[in-house]
Amino acid sequence: MITTLAALALLADDDWNFKLSLGFDASGDAQTVTNFRVDIEGDQKAEDHSYETLLRIQYGESEGERIRNDVEARFRGDWKSDEERWGLFSDTRFRIDEFQNFDTRLTESLGGTYQIYENEGDKKWNLDAVFGGGFRLDSGLIDPNADEFVPEGNIGFRGSMEPSERHVLKGSLFLYPDLDGLEDYRTFTNIDWNYMLDPDQGLSLRINADQEYDTARLVRSAWNVKVMVQMEL
């Protein structure tokens, strides 16, 4: 919650870059399916820190019936330490989802990062390890006996690659074990590819795929893939 309040203050800073991504698809073969997604992303980078924020809205219908309706907000901060390769991070996420076993979910993770590899040559790429702990807090649970507050660990990797000036590929994989029993856990996987179509206009083609799996809440585990147009604001 502290990082959520800090995020609001940080967003007031002028030194931010914002991007808008729009994705839409529709089909009318065996059934009529319509989906859309809106991402508003922001980032701020300095020598000693970096911040990332995201607001995502997703909606879908099939044969006139609503099949998806969720909103997610994220804020992540990374701070470099005096020790080379080491750093600290804070990751806050808040989600409202009509079609899960909960109405709202707040997650918070704090911990350390270690830079496994970094290449600043023509093909820039880096790989970081992430480790720490935090919690998830759910409301509106379908199961009245389920715990609303659960402490969690956080282990994972994240990296990025720039094969050329126009291509950027990012990916991350995180495991969140339930510290109350360790038999339950969450995983989150994300892959993001961006191709710059028009550098002057800040227009890009973006393909994003993510998957979340939760053994305790039976969160949908299917890949969420979207082809989007991204523009700099």
Question: For the regions a protein language model found, what residue spans apply to each?
Answer:
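Cleavable N-terminal export/targeting peptides
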Residues: M1-D15
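Repeated loop/turn-to-beta-strand initiation elements of outer-membrane beta-barrel proteins
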Residues: W16, E47-T53, E83-L88, N119-K124, ...
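Residues that define the transmembrane beta-barrel architecture of outer-membrane proteins
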Residues: W16, T32-F36, I67-V71, T104-E108, ...
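Membrane-embedded beta-strand positions of outer-membrane beta-barrel proteins
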Residues: L20-L22, T53-L55, L88-T92, L110, ...
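Transmembrane beta-strands of outer-membrane beta-barrel pores
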Residues: F24-G28, A46, I57-E61, T92-E98, ...
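Structural signature of outer-membrane beta-barrel channels/translocons
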Residues: S27, E41-E47, D78-D82, R95, ...
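Outer-membrane beta-barrel transmembrane domain signature
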Residues: D122-S204
